[in-house]
Structure formats: C-alpha cells, structure tokens
Amino acid sequence: MSLRRSVLMGNFKEDDNVTTPLEGSRLERVERKDCPAEHLSDYDEVLRTRGMETMPHVFALLANSPAALAAVCPVGAHVRYGTEFDDALREYVIMTVAQELRCTYEWVHHYVVAKRVGASDDLLKKIGTPAMESEPGDIGLATRYARMLTRNEEIPDDMADALKASFGAKGFVDMTIMIGYYGMLARFINTVKIPIEDTYEIPPFNV
C-alpha cells in the first residue's frame, strides 16, 4: 500500500514514519507518527492537496510547529492551485521571488514545475532581468510587481491600476498574497537551511 493511500485511510504501522534528522538543516523532519493527533488532518491535507506520497522537506520542517503548518499550508494550496493565473505566469512570479531572496531550494523546485507546465526556456533565462520585466502583457507586469514587492519597494498607483485591469480585484489580491507567501516560505527555508534533494539539478540564478 502506498504512503498516500495509507494517509488517506489512516492506516499506518508503528514504524511507517519516525521523526528524522535532516543533514545540514537546523530542524528535524516531523513525520506523521510524531504529529500531534489534533493536527493529523492538517498533515494529511498537505499530502492530499499536493498529490504527494511523502511530506516535502519544507512542510516536514514547518510541522515542528503543527499550528503553523495548519495555518500556512492552506494559503499555499490556494495560491498554487486555487487561482486563475496561467500556470507558467505563476511560476515566473514565484521564481522571481525565489531569486530575489536567493532561495535556491525554492528556485530549483519551481524550475522543475515551470518546465512541466510549459514555461518558455527563453523566459526562464530572463527571470529577474530588465528584459523579463519588459515583456509585453501580464508577464512583464507581474514579474516587475513580484520583484518590487519582494524588495519592499513602494508600488505606484499606475502599477496597481494595471494589475487590477489585467487580473481584476480578486487577481490583484491573489497575486499579492502569492508573492507574500512564497517570500515567507523562502525566508523560512533559508533560515532553517533546508538542503536540496540529491535528485535535483541546480540551475544557476540569472542575476
């Protein structure tokens, strides 16, 4: 039986999941067995919404504070899966944030996602550059907004108006929350020093 199926059925053996050290990190992974009973449904929901069989490092470390996991992960699920943004556009924005904050883990993971959803190789190489922000339409606008917001720069009225014109009030809110969420996650990752899994190649930052 797969771990995901076991999660959904609540069918775990005693030794299925044990909290384990993560080499190079400042925190240990919290596996399902060690998650407090009142937060097991939150732990399982992360697996369900992400379609994964094992908990990714970032969420397994976040689970050192189960209530934080319960509060943070639904926001991530919404901005990743519950918005109306084009998939490639979403990844350009996330990767802009990751590069600004020098979060290699987030950059690498979303590079893979970006390729999977059909992001352009040419545009992936432009992320964070003036050329990317000069792209016509939503791409240039959204990535410029992501960079400025991550740097805590003041957002001019004409940019806010353009974002609302392109994405509507709902999309403007979703875009802002998405940038903030991935900025928060990047800072957490960098602070607790989450190592990149051996199976990933590491494309360099563009800038």
Question: Model-found features: residue ranges?
Answer:
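Hydrophobic alpha-helical segments
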Residues: S2-V207
